[in-house]
Design a protein with these regions (language model features):
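Juxtamembrane intracellular "pre-TM" segments in multi-pass secondary transporters
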Residues: 79-103
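Cytoplasmic helix-loop-helix junction between adjacent transmembrane helices
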Residues: 1-32
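A late C-terminal transmembrane helix in Major Facilitator Superfamily
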Residues: 218-251
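C-terminal transmembrane helical hairpin of 12-TM major facilitator-type secondary transporters
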Residues: 164-208
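Glycine-rich segments within core transmembrane alpha-helices of 12-TM secondary carriers
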Residues: 22-41, 230-238
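Helix-loop-helix hairpin linking two adjacent transmembrane segments in secondary transporters
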Residues: 29-76
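Extracytoplasmic gate region of multi-pass secondary transporters
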Residues: 98-141
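Helix-to-loop junctions at the C-terminal end of transmembrane segments
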Residues: 150-162, 246
Length: 274
């Protein structure tokens, strides 16, 4: 619950304090720290576990979170957009906004693809290739590394290239990555494919949230919440669907399902720009 609120509110805050030219870049920079945490924290915890007990590490984690809270208490945040309270009528009306729903369903598939990659890639590589489990996990790490590096690069690219062009190119890059996985790859090809997938998925959240923040500036926090809830539903449903289909047919369908999902995202994005 806390993580979901933090995710939504930090994105909304960055969108609110950024002008139109900077919004995509700043949201991308914010998203890069997700990847840095995903890569760095497990390594840090593994290192600390050699010297400290689980209880000490957990207490230390709590202290770090408390320091973060105390730091935020001293920050001067922007004034509320709705000083008289939450506009229930306007907020509920967002659920009828076709533009918001189209953009949210792009995140539905984006979040679903990320979740499926994290949960099914190692099984796919284990059953369709001769790659050992430890190297399959390393290939999966390549996806997070690709996503993190790409988001850092996007901070610069968004200032020079239209975000619509960046998103289309990124999704096609992810399609190429999944295509590499369909050829029963060795480790090198699998790792390259996963880097391309991570890099290809990097721009979706920054671009879509930037557009939502611009179109629904007066209710950006609520609009972001709608989009992120739909995204989380997508992660759950696509994971379940992958499990059902892989049991009925074979895990070999996994990359093809992801390619179809990416093509749907491209179609939804094209429609959302009209």
């Amino acid at each position: 619950l806390g993580g979901g609120i933090l995710n939504g509110e930090t994105n909304a805050l960055v969108a609110d304090i950024s002008n139109e030219a900077e919004k995509g870049s700043r949201l991308s920079l914010l998203g890069a720290f997700y990847g840095i945490g995903a890569l760095g924290i497990p390594v840090l915890l593994s290192f600390l576990s050699e010297y400290y007990s689980f209880e000490i590490i957990l207490q230390g984690t709590g202290m770090v979170m408390l320091i973060g809270i105390l730091f935020c208490l001293g920050i001067r945040f922007p004034a509320p957009k709705q000083p008289q309270g939450f506009p229930i009528k306007e907020g509920s009306g967002l659920l009828k906004e076709s533009s918001l729903l189209l953009l949210s369903f792009i995140l539905f598939f984006q979040s679903g693809i990320e979740g499926v990659c994290n949960n099914w890639t190692t099984l796919y590589l284990g059953q369709t290739t001769s790659i050992p489990e430890n190297r399959a996990l390393l290939a999966l790490t390549c996806m997070v590394a690709g996503l993190t590096v790409a988001r850092l690069l996007l901070v610069v690219l968004f200032k020079k290239i239209k975000q619509e062009t960046v998103l289309r190119t990124s999704l096609i890059t992810a399609v190429v990555g999944f295509t590499l996985l369909t050829f029963a790859p060795g480790f090198a090809r699998a790792a390259i494919g996963m880097v391309l997938i991570g890099a290809g998925l990097a721009s979706t959240f920054p671009v879509i949230l930037s557009i939502i923040g611009s179109r629904y500036a007066s209710l950006s926090g609520t609009a972001f919440s709608v989009a992120l809830v739909i995204a989380l539903i997508g992660q759950t449903l696509l994971n379940s669907l992958t499990g059902i289909i892989s049991q009925g047919y074979s895990i070999v369908v996994y990359p093809y399902m992801m390619i179809v999902s990416l093509l749907i995202m491209l179609l939804l994005f094209k429609r959302s720009l009209k």
